[in-house]
Amino acid sequence: MDGQKRKILIVDDDAFLLDMYAIKFSQNNFEVHTAMGGTQSIDKLKAGLVPDIILMDLIMPEMDGFEMLEKINTEKLSPNSVKIVLSNKSQQSDIERATNLGVAGYIVKASSTPIEVVEQVIGILNKKVLNEKK
């Protein structure tokens, strides 16, 4: 990346995972914002948070990741943010549904260490930036 701090909104209903990923992304020059679930993330976006990346779980109470993506799209919240799923759901139908809702990447939690997640997010972001320059 270009040394500039990227803003990331991490959305999960597991406080331990939120803290762990917040630390890892902070150590890698990200400005980190967290939300405990889809509802809180939508509230933050409506309040004016404009992250470069939204990293979200799919399995959450109240509003799951799919509902969150639908709301982000319908209400045109943070339309330029790169949306990435980080979930234990690994069925092809879930990946296709998320892709159809506009995610740029899909990371399976169980097969990725926290630092691998950071590296994959950076890779997805860099690929998106390169594609926009073409």
Regions found by a protein language model. Name each.
Residues D57, S87:
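Active-site residues of response regulator receiver
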Residues D19-Q27:
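Charged docking surfaces used in two-component/phosphorelay signaling
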Residues M1-K7, P114-K134:
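Non-catalytic signal-transmission and effector/linker regions of two-component phosphorelay proteins
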Residues L49-L55:
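Active-site beta3 strand of CheY-like receiver
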Residues D43, F66-P79:
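Short amphipathic alpha-helix used as the core "switch/output" element in two-component signaling
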Residues T34-D43, G65:
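Helix N-cap/capping motif at the beta->alpha junctions
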Residues M60:
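Receiver (REC) domain active-site loop signature in two-component systems and cognate sites
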